Amino acid sequence: MEKVIIKIKTENAAFEEVGVGNELARILKDMADQLEDAYNFPKTLMDLNGNKVGTVEYE
């Protein structure tokens, strides 16, 4: 069985500045755009401030 694992840490300033829901939505929309354009799983997820906050794995 194949699966996608998305891990996102919500402990930094970007999530406090715009709210957890807003920042999660922005990150997931960005990931979705990358998938739609090239079926390319981003390995690293970045917050609004350019910090690494998560990973995507395809198994």
Q: What are the functions of these language-model segments?
A:
Residues 1-29:
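N-terminal acidic leader/helix
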